[in-house]
């Protein structure tokens, strides 16, 4: 008989910070407002465009009124509403109101085309849409067909209600709702590691855990307090902003300064005027700050924390932006929508900070486990060896909506979420991202699914095959480019194809270059060999 070999134990990495108590039984809204007795009269939201201010007590009350208003419109516990909105105070009231009602918010990018919004409406089964008048045309026909109520936060067109109707509801008429910690509260859409966008089911327990991992405890990983002012420039339809700004900000009692869109001069003016202390950014904003000559005209000395996430930030860019914020600690976090979203965060942001290295994206968050695995064998790897990053903890998603197969592909039987990102953990527990297994293209932090663009390209009558891959771009990080096989006899041009795509997708999904080839490289099973195409781009060996 052969020797009995014990199974190899996983090499698991944990935070340098000790685990903490997390009140996972609380609904998200209760958790966010748990400290309201201490901050009730303090400014909670400031509308950067108008200067209008709401206290914590007002935000909490208006959110409960919206919950009652949703109930009066027939929204039941477990129903889904769509938020098709730019950053605004109403975004907070709507999301929190839905949470109080026991409903689910699915967040859509207002710049989506009508087809993209309707696809998400269909998939999420949303029963109500909260939007602005300028976006109503994208949804009105589908909403009329499916009897979906549209609510506008500004001048409501015909057949639409004004958001004030929700805010005027009597909060005392809201029926009691018993929320289970495993109930879904947010349904962002993500392409995951591959394929088309899917609904990511984030629960009350998951988001409470993720927020607590960042801002709770005696030595929070992300130290924020009630005297802080945090700028909300990242779109709230992105999970990074929804989690780090809306949820973490409310939990920590900070003042949240809302900006609808990024424009460098108004952005700098607001930082100076309101003495912003915390800036959650993405690399394109960091790049704009680093390169803009106007930055030096403004006093940015109030800023003490600059966080960057959603896409990797290079060491050179880190160093360049440090000079612009003389009193700030700059660091990165690492997230993925399916992970709730934060997997790792820079410990320079802690109340009792640690030394960090440039280029690192933090250490694994508390109350969670991380491992690095060999993508081929799934065996866990030691420090300083590159492999796929996996995370386990209560913060990760419940699964993909109505897609058990993709859920099983992403979360294994032992509860490990496989990110599709390649990285390593060094001797100081810091995580470095070096590559991606997954196919997703990151344009300015936005996800672009190659499969979605490939499916669209193949509807063009003169294209017989197509593949979409990323190309490195200094401003955007990555841009989508297409390799296209023309149908025999046709001479379709690059410009025609780019126009064909741009008419049907949101701006960040537009094709930047088209390369015509005789065939798309594929494996025997028919899978596109994207590495071969990426190698062509890297070497400059591109068809004319």
From Swiss-Prot:
Reaction(s) the record says it catalyses: (E)-4-coumarate + ATP + CoA = (E)-4-coumaroyl-CoA + AMP + diphosphate; (E)-4-coumarate + ATP + H(+) = (E)-4-coumaroyl-AMP + diphosphate; (E)-4-coumaroyl-AMP + CoA = (E)-4-coumaroyl-CoA + AMP + H(+)
CDD domains: 4CL
PROSITE patterns in the cross-refs: AMP_BINDING
Pathway linked to the protein: Phytoalexin biosynthesis; 3,4',5-trihydroxystilbene biosynthesis; 3,4',5-trihydroxystilbene from trans-4-coumarate: step 1/2
EC number of the protein: 6.2.1.12
Gene Ontology MF terms: 4-coumarate-CoA ligase activity; ATP binding
Cofactors named for this entry: Mg(2+)
Residues annotated as binding CoA: 261, 444-445
UniProt region (SBD2), positions on chain: 333-400
Binding-site list for ATP: 190-194, 198, 332-333, 337, 421, 436, 527
InterPro entries in alphabetical order: AMP-bd_C, AMP-bd_C_sf, AMP-binding_CS, AMP-dep_synth/lig_dom, ANL_N_sf
Alphabetic keyword roster: ATP-binding, Ligase, Magnesium, Nucleotide-binding, Phenylpropanoid metabolism
EC main group: ligase
Induction of its expression: By fungal elicitor and UV irradiation.
Sequence segments annotated as region (SBD1): 263-332
One Gene Ontology biological process: phenylpropanoid metabolic process
Amino-acid positions noted as binding (E)-4-coumaroyl-AMP in the UniProt annotation, renumbered to this chain: 240, 310, 332-333, 337, 345, 438, 442
Cross-referenced PANTHER family: 4-COUMARATE--COA LIGASE 2, LONG-CHAIN-FATTY-ACID--COA LIGASE
Function: Carboxylate--CoA ligase that may use 4-coumarate as substrate. Follows a two-step reaction mechanism, wherein the carboxylate substrate first undergoes adenylation by ATP, followed by a thioesterification in the presence of CoA to yield the final CoA thioester.
Description of its domains: Both substrate-binding domains (SBD1 and SBD2) are involved in the substrate recognition, and are sufficient to confer the substrate specificity.
Family stated for the protein in its record: Belongs to the ATP-dependent AMP-binding enzyme family.
Descriptive protein name: 4-coumarate--CoA ligase 2
């Amino acid at each position: 008989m052969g020797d009995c070999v014990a199974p190899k134990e996983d090499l698991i990495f944990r935070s340098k910070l000790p685990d903490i108590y997390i009140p996972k039984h609380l609904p998200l809204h209760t958790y966010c407002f748990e400290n309201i007795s201490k901050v009730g009269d303090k400014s909670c939201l400031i509308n950067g465009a108008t200067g209008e201010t709401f206290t914590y007590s007002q935000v909490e009350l208006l959110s409960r009124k919206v919950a009652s208003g949703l109930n009066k419109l027939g929204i039941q516990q477990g129903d889904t509403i769509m938020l098709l909105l730019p950053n605004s105070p109403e975004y907070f009231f709507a999301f929190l109101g839905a949470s109080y009602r026991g409903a689910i918010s699915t967040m859509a990018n207002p710049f989506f085309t009508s087809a993209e919004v309707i696809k998400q409406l269909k998939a999420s089964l949303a029963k109500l849409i909260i939007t602005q008048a300028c976006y109503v045309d994208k949804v009105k026909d589908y909403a009329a067909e499916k009897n979906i109520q549209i609510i506008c936060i500004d001048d409501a067109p015909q057949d639409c209600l004004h958001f004030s109707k929700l805010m005027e509801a009597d909060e005392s008429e809201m029926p009691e709702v018993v929320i289970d910690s495993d109930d879904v509260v947010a349904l962002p859409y993500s392409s995951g590691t591959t394929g088309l966008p899917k609904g990511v089911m984030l629960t009350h327990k998951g988001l409470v855990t993720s927020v607590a991992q960042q801002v709770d405890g005696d030595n929070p990983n992300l130290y924020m307090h009630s005297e802080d002012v945090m700028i909300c420039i990242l779109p709230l339809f992105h999970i990074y902003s929804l989690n780090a700004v809306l949820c973490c900000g409310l939990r920590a009692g900070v003042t949240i300064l809302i900006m609808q869109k990024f424009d460098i001069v108004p952005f700098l003016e607001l930082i100076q005027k309101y003495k912003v202390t915390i800036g959650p950014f993405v690399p394109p904003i960091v790049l704009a700050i680093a390169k803009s000559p106007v930055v030096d005209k403004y006093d940015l000395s109030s800023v003490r924390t600059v966080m960057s996430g959603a896409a990797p930030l290079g060491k050179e860019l880190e160093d360049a932006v440090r000079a612009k914020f003389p009193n700030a600690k700059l660091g990165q976090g690492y997230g993925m929508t399916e992970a709730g979203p934060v997997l790792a965060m820079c410990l320079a942001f802690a109340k009792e900070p640690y030394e960090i290295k440039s280029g690192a994206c933090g250490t694994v968050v508390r109350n969670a486990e991380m491992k690095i695995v060999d993508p081929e064998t799934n065996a866990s790897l030691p420090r300083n060896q590159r492999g796929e990053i996996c995370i386990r903890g209560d913060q990760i998603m419940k699964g993909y909506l109505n897609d058990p197969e993709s859920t099983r592909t992403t979360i294994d039987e032992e509860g490990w979420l496989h990110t599709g990102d390649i990285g390593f953990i060094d001797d100081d527990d810091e995580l470095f991202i070096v590559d991606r297994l997954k196919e997703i293209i990151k344009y300015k932090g936005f996800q672009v699914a190659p499969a979605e663009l490939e499916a669209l390209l193949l509807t063009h009558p003169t294209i017989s095959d197509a593949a979409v891959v990323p190309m490195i771009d200094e401003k955007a990080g990555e841009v989508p480019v297409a390799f296209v096989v023309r149908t025999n006899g046709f001479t379709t041009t690059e410009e025609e194809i780019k126009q064909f795509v741009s008419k049907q997708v949101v701006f960040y999904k537009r094709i930047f270059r088209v390369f015509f080839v005789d065939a798309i490289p594929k494996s025997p099973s028919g899978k596109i060999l994207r590495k071969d195409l990426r190698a062509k781009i890297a070497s400059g060996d591109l068809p004319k």
